[in-house]
Amino acid sequence: MASLDSHVLMKLGSLFLSTLFVSIVSSESQCRNFESIISFGDSIADTGNLLGLSDHNNLPMSAFPPYGETFFHHPTGRFSDGRLIIDFIAEFLGLPYVPPYFGSTNGNFEKGVNFAVASATALESSFLEEKGYHCPHNFSLGVQLKIFKQSLPNLCGLPSDCRDMIGNALILMGEIGANDYNFPFFQLRPLDEVKELVPLVISTISSAITELIGMGGRTFLVPGGFPLGCSVAFLTLHQTSNMEEYDPLTGCLKWLNKFGEYHSEQLQEELNRLRKLNPHVNIIYADYYNASLRLGREPSKYGFINRHLSACCGVGGPYNFNLSRSCGSVGVEACSDPSKYVAWDGLHMTEAAHKSMADGLVKGPYAIPPFDWSCLSSMIKKKEVVGNTIFFDE
């Protein structure tokens, strides 16, 4: 009888500790009413920074039609036909679209600020250039973070106010790091050589998060990489007659997708380490890899055509892509219905694909751990945002 009582007590003690642990974790991931979005990254989140930084004689392709045609009805500097993932997240939160920091005339950054620049890398461009990887500019993650810190007096004034602003913001960390791999892959560098960059990229992202935590950051959305083997550009560049290199279900290159998985796995391991070191901080992994891959596995389920590996805007070849005649060039037209396509220009996605990706993040299951929006539902229903339309069901 005594042994049974002891067993019961142990069970009760275990249950108490488990309940206590869940309560502690839940309290740290409880619903928060974000007052703004602070964004870093590359073209996946760039809402116009590269355009604002560019000389009028050397504008990016995103400055020309048909970019922006679907929603804004004119080019905005976004590398898509319309809105990006960050735009749909802003809509869901009832916030205005996050303005680019560069090139904004009388920009209002009270509800958000975006430092993401197309073609940006995680690692410093000088480091990559030394390895022989050409970078078009140096707006690495470190540079973006430095500019953010320099801008704080104008953004929020006093240090205490800035700490509050950062603490009440959803901080979007990318996607960043893809170009660190894209540039050498475009130069046909060996896989093992590119793989050596992964720990350096992960460490750089981790250091940036740690620095922002020290500045008061409490909630981070950290995207992983995309399935590079499904990129129209890489499918064109690495085209082969060996069908064993392709996934029979998606048509994507298996070896490149495995590389993307490796990056995402390493990033998740590092985020787990950061969570243990900072239990008061909510670090959410955005599974861009699987949120994107599902569109290739079952395109018709999500409203896309079965030829999901064909660019909407492009010309030539089996994937409607030619790097020397890219979208935005004279004579290169877009498809009649971009909403049926996953790929926009061979390197970036359509607005429809971005909406599906964002939907998978804010409503799960591609946010790990998932967001808790319980305190936002009534607010979002009541809030009116001029020029924005909320597409997510409550």
Swiss-Prot record:
Point out the glycosylated residues in this chain: N138, N290, N322
Question: What broad class describes the main subcellular location of this protein?
Answer: secreted
* Record EC number: 3.1.1.-
Entry keywords, A to Z: Glycoprotein, Hydrolase, Lipid degradation, Lipid metabolism, Secreted, Signal
- Keyword field contains Nucleotide-binding: no
Signal peptide interval: 1-27
Q: Which family does it belong to?
A: Belongs to the 'GDSL' lipolytic enzyme family.
Identify the PANTHER family for this entry: SINAPINE ESTERASE, ZINC FINGER FYVE DOMAIN CONTAINING PROTEIN
Its protein name is GDSL esterase/lipase At1g31550
Instruction: Give the species this sequence originates from.
Output: Arabidopsis thaliana
